[in-house]
Each structure stands twice: as structure tokens, then as C-alpha cells.
């Protein structure tokens, strides 16, 4: 079970926390861990919902259809690092796959949190091993960063 005390242990060593997904962002906010970058689409398991209420400073809007990684979305992931934080990337379409370029591009030590439907939160601390695995997946998808 995710609690603020066990998240505190995980998050204390990271200078950047990224949430991918509306429910994931909402969970982190409710536990007192506002993400530095949140990627949301106003949907939960493809059902329309209100996006989480958060105090983001910068907003990037992109189009990214289901099961795709568009150039526009990839650029937004890259651009978010240079915006005033916290940043919301709002996706018209689907945000799920954006965890992959985030893991491939963001600094080592970044915490990336996303949801596994009907299971719970997945928390990854970017290291060289996970980055290499994700780049292999992106290459198989013919995605160039």
C-alpha cells in the first residue's frame, strides 16, 4: 500500500518527480507529493474524467492519439524540463506511452510514477539499466528521440 511515509523514503533522494496519468497525479497530490511534471489527459482507463486539480505554473497542450507517440508529444516531454515548474502536460488523446520518452530523456535519478490499471502505482527511479531497456523498446517502435 502506498503511504506518504514510504513515498517520502523513495522521493527524498530525487530532485525531479514526474507523474504520468490523471489518477496517478491525483494520488500523489492527495498524499502531499505534488509532481514537478504531470502528464494528464482528462481520462482514466479511457473514460472521460475531470483532470486533477493542481497548482501548476506552466501548461503545455499536445495532441497524441491512442497508442501513439507523436513528434509534438515528444517535443512537449523535452520542453517541459525548461519550463517553470510545476508543469502540466495536457494531452488531447492518450498520455500512457509518454512515460517511455520521459524515462529515455530525463536525468538519471528522476522518479517516474505511473499507474498499472487494477494493480496500483509503478514507481521507477531512472537509472542506466531502465533507460537502456526503454530505448530498446522505443527503437522497436521506430521512435527517434
Predicted regions and their residues:
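Conserved mixed alpha/beta catalytic, RNA-binding, or beta-rich assembly cores of soluble enzyme
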Residues: 1-131
Amino acid at each position: 500500500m502506498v503511504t506518504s511515509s514510504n513515498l517520502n523514503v523513495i522521493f527524498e533522494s530525487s530532485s525531479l518527480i514526474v507523474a504520468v496519468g490523471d489518477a496517478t497525479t491525483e494520488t500523489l497530490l492527495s498524499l502531499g507529493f505534488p509532481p514537478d511534471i504531470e502528464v494528464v489527459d482528462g481520462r482514466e482507463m479511457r473514460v472521460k474524467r475531470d483532470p486533477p486539480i493542481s497548482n501548476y505554473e506552466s501548461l503545455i497542450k499536445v495532441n497524441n492519439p491512442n497508442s501513439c507517440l507523436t513528434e509534438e508529444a515528444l517535443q512537449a516531454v523535452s520542453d517541459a524540463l525548461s519550463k517553470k515548474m510545476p508543469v502540466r502536460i495536457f494531452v488531447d488523446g492518450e498520455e500512457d506511452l509518454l512515460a517511455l520518452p520521459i524515462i529515455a530523456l530525463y536525468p538519471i535519478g528522476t522518479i517516474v510514477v505511473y499507474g498499472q490499471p487494477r494493480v496500483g502505482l509503478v514507481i521507477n527511479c531512472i537509472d542506466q539499466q531502465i533507460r537502456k531497456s526503454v530505448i530498446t523498446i522505443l527503437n522497436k517502435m521506430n521512435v527517434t528521440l
